[in-house]
Amino acid sequence: MKKRKESFWGLHFDFHARPDDKHIGRDLTEDDVREICRILKPDFIQIDCKGHSGWTSYPSKLGNAVPDMEKDTLSLWRKVTMEEDVALYMHYSGVYERKYCAEHPEERALMWNGKHHAESIRLNGAYVDELLIPQLKELAGDYRVNGVWIDGDCWMGV
C-alpha cells in the first residue's frame, strides 16, 4: 500500500452527511468499492467521515452519527481497500462544526468584533479534547484509516 507521499492518483468522495439524509449506506456494496479499486486503480481513496454539519457518516461512538444509517460504509470501504491494497483517508471537518457550535455556543470562536461566530469552533476550548482527538483516535484505532484530511481550518478559522 502506498504512503501518501508516494501517491499521485486519488479519489475524493465528498459526502457530508446530515441528519435529514435517509438510508445512508443502503445501496453501497463491497462489489461497488472493489470495482472502483480495480478499474480506476487509485493510489488512495478519501471519503467523508464528518462534514461541516458536524454529523458523522459512520457509526461513531461519540454521539454525532447521523440517525438514519443502514450500513457502516466506513467499515465496508476499509475492508475492501485493505484487500485491494489501496490507502484510505478520511475527510474530517475541523473548526467548521455546526452541530457542536449549536450544542455548545460558549465554545464558538470569538471574532474581532467580540461576537461569537455561528459555525466556527475555538480550538482552545473543550472541543479538541471532547470530540476532535477522541474521534481521530476512533478512526485510527477502530477503522485503521491511513490518514485524515482536516477540512475548513484554513478558510473557516476565525
Task: Annotate each PLM feature.
Residues H12-L28, T56-D72, G114-I133:
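The substrate-binding groove and active-site-proximal loops of carbohydrate-active enzymes
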Residues D32-I36, L40, T73, W77, ...:
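Alpha-helical packing segments of well-folded alpha/beta enzyme cores
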Residues M90-V145, G152, G157-V158:
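Active-site-adjacent "subsite" loops/lids of carbohydrate-active enzymes
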Residues V33, R38-T73, Y96-R108, N113-H116, ...:
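Aromatic-lined carbohydrate-binding/catalytic grooves of carbohydrate-active enzymes
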Residues M1-H52, V86:
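N-terminal structural segment of carbohydrate-active enzymes
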